[in-house]
UniProtKB/Swiss-Prot annotation:
Keywords: Cytoplasm, Methylation, Protein biosynthesis. It comes from the Bacteria. Pfam families: PCRF (PF03462), RF-1 (PF00472). It comes from Listeria monocytogenes serotype 4b (strain F2365). It is found in: Cytoplasm. GO terms for molecular function: translation release factor activity, codon specific. The keyword NADP does not apply. This is Peptide chain release factor 2. PANTHER family: CLASS I PEPTIDE CHAIN RELEASE FACTOR, PEPTIDE CHAIN RELEASE FACTOR 2. InterPro entries: PCRF, Pep_chain_release_fac_I, Pep_chain_release_fac_I_sf, PrfB.
Amino acid sequence: MELAEIRNELEKTAQQIKDFRGSLDLDSMEVRIAELEDQMLDPNFWNDQQAAQKVINESNGYKETYQAFHALEEEQESMEISLELLKEEADEDLQEELEKDIKAYMATISEFELKLMLSDPYDKNNAILELHPGAGGTESQDWGSMLLRMYQRWSEKKGFKVEMLDYQAGDEAGIKSVTLLIKGHNAYGYLKAEKGVHRLVRISPFDSSGRRHTSFVSVDVMPELDDDIEIEVRTEDLKIDTYRATGAGGQHINTTDSAVRMTHIPSGIVVTCQSERSQLKNREQAMKMLKTKLYQKEQEEKERELAEIRGEQKEIGWGSQIRSYVFHPYSMVKDHRTNYETGNIQAVMDGDLDEFINAYLRSRIG
C-alpha cells in the first residue's frame, strides 16, 4: 500500500468517525450515564431487583458505546501520527505495521457500526414474519409466494432456521397468507427493515393478453417475545376455532383438527397456527403470537401519541410502500426509503437482501 493509499483510507475512516460523533449525541449520553449512576447510589436501589437490573443494563449499554467510540477516536489519531512520521522519513517496518493496523481498524469500525444499527431492545430476538397479498387475486397471491421464497433463501444464507407457523394457499397459485418464525441471532433486527408494502411490476403470466400488472404484498415483522413479557389476555376475550391443517397446494396434512385460529375480541386481532401436529402446541404458539401482536399494538399506540405531541406527520404501521420490484419494461429493485437500488433483480429474488437491509439500518443511525 502506497502512502497516498494509506492517506485515502485514513481520510475515509476519519469521516466515518465524524459521522458516528454526529449521530451518537455524546453530550446527552454523558448526562444519561451520570443520571443512571446516581440512581445506582440510592440506598433503596436494590429494593426492586428487576428495575435495578434494567438500570444497570442501560448504563452498561451506554458506557460500552461511549468507551468504544472514544477508543476508535484514539486509534484514528494514533494512525494519523504514524502517517505523519512516514511522510517525514521512510520506515518499512512502521509502514507495514500501519497497513495491518488500518485493516484491523476498518473491521472494528464495521463491528461498531453494526452494533449501532442493531441496538434496539428486541433486535437480537427471533422474528415472526407475515405475508399478506393485497387485492388482485391470483396475481398478488403469486407475488406473495415469490416473496416467501425470497425470505426463505435469505434466511438460509444467514444460517437462520425457518418454521412455517401458518400457510394459506392461493385459489389458483401462490398464497393467501403465510406466517414464518425465523430463528437466529438478530433475526428481528435485520428483518424489521422489510416491514411495509412491497410492489411488483411485471408482464403477468396469468394474463393471456400479455399486459403489464402491478401487485402489492404487505410484509409485517414482529419480534418473538420472551416469556417474561407480561401481557394479560383474559379467557373471556378469546374466540378459539380449530380446523384441519393444510399444506402447499391445499392438501390436508393432518387428519385431526389440530390447526388453531385465535381471535382477540376487544382488539380484533386474529392469529393462526398449524405448524405442530398437536392442537395444544398450536394453541401455545398462537397465544405467543397474540401476545406479541398485542404488545406491538401497545408500542405503536405509544409511538402515535409521541408523534402527535411532536407534531410529526409520521405514518406508523405497515401501510406504507417501501420497495418496488420492476421486471418490465426494465429490471430494477428500488427501496423508496433509502433510494438504494440494483438492476440485478434475480439476485434479490434469490435472497440477496443484505445491501437493502444495511442501507435501511444505516439510515436509522442518524
